[in-house]
């Protein structure tokens, strides 16, 4: 028993045990209040176990001490029971705390580390790095705050609530693209049906009807959703099937499969092409070659006609000729006439960097062809794959491709019904085993077209454009000696482009002549500004060529002379033969040399030896080539006789010296003949040069008028 005095209440006498029980009651109430008030203590919850007590519980109200504050009770208890809390805290070896301190040292010992305090002072302070500052800012984000506690049912409930609260707080600091990731598993809070009816104040009499309507609407919505899902599923299935059919169609298309189809290993995809739109009617100017290939077409159409008599058609046909004469077009026409599959391959497509790729592609090509026999295999630029085999240690595997080609064409296994057509510009470079009978045992020459062939080709291409009725293809054909079919096609196309640029509705002879001059002499360069001195030198230089060509008996006729810069030259004189030349006589070769010398001779006679130019370099090259061929190839030297000297590097020094001496004699004699002609016709030379300075370009008729001493009409 003890007495307690206070200014507020009169003196009251209570037992000590009652006072202690009353003291514990408000302490527990205050702790629970403080725990619910602090959000941090929500995260650090500890399981509370309350043991049942049989003793009656007294509170301050029963004792008449309800007006005392908790702080006053703590102070009174500490004064009455000194060392109560201190002894209780010291008796335990652990310091329990629900909230973590700033450091592990403070959590363990209960006070700060002096060394850490000094280090955090201004004397030891360092500027934080960028990455360190970012990490320190991130650790304060709610999403990174750790939550520790015992895994009890109550703590689990509170942890789930705190997690949802942190996610809600994270929405304000997280970027927009992270919010969906953070909240992807958060479901929508659904309100129960009973709670909804209570909120809407629906009477109990109408609640059954409300539930029935809600159920019917839910079932209808489910049916509609199921129908929509089924429709989407069917649509996706249809699109997938269409995609598969599209890919299959691309792979089977003969024109697109080469690009889109891939094969296993290193073999390339091989697909035939039907040439139904190309026949022999499209081939002009090579009548003899077409007749040779008619036998192949007949065999492909009617093979029994030949097998009954015991005859066999050639397995391979070799087309030989200069570029642009129509070798590829002939091969396509053969396949088109016979209406059989056509396999095209270039000689450079077989070999690559990997060993054995060429032979593998040859096998693949012939395997596909045999499966689709009868058919035609056309190998363009055959010399690229079928060249002569030589001993070369750097590439010992380069001969595998040609050996495989030889075996496929005439090996142990026959290839009935497969016709191989090869095309090359250099038949002398092919291997001898490739062109023997049984492989390429038929050789067809495809030459440049003659006047008749050029006329047919020009008519064929002119019918594809709009041209004037005054256009005469024979005149253009006579002026395009040596042109191939491809060059004639280019001539007509250039004329059509010129007419379109000039705004004309159809092509006339003027555009065709312009196109011919552009091909023979090069395009005009009208923007080049040449001073009068160089223009005068060019006029006399070109006039010298024209005078020699006009007054030399066996020289080719003049087609046109111009001092307009064309291509790399400042002027040009075009010469064209009247008819096709199948052979050239010695006098014609000497005349060509004389015409080449005319430019330099004119410069020397008019301006002196100190003012000759470098413009005659190409003329000297042409004259030297003609003289060298006359001596070493044509046997036109009296001293060396009828003997050819193909490899001058293997000749003796005396023979080489004799060849050079003969070439030098021919060139000197040609130079003297040109000088004699220009001295004899000095007046005509001057008149022609002045006419070129006035008109810049003169054709054959205008040159003849000037040399006859007549005046030209004003243009």
Curated annotation (Swiss-Prot):
The active site is at 542. It catalyses: ATP + H2O = ADP + phosphate + H(+). It comes from the Eukaryota. Its EC number is 3.4.24.-, 3.6.-.-. The chain crosses the membrane at residues 238-258. Residues 41-52 have a biased composition (Basic and acidic residues). Residues 31-54 are annotated as: Disordered. Keywords: ATP-binding, Hydrolase, Membrane, Metal-binding, Metalloprotease, Mitochondrion, Mitochondrion inner membrane, Nucleotide-binding, Protease, Transmembrane, Transmembrane helix, Zinc. Pfam families: AAA, AAA_lid_3, Peptidase_M41. NCBIfam families: FtsH_fam. ATP-dependent metalloprotease that catalyzes the degradation of folded and unfolded proteins with a suitable degron sequence in the mitochondrial intermembrane region. Plays an important role in regulating mitochondrial morphology and function by cleaving OPA1 at position S2, giving rise to a form of OPA1 that promotes maintenance of normal mitochondrial structure and mitochondrial protein metabolism. Homohexamer; may also form heterohexamers. Exists in several complexes of 600-1100 kDa. Interacts with AFG1L. This is ATP-dependent zinc metalloprotease YME1L1. It comes from Rattus norvegicus (Rat). The lineage of its organism: Eukaryota, Metazoa, Chordata, Craniata, Vertebrata. The gene is Yme1l1.
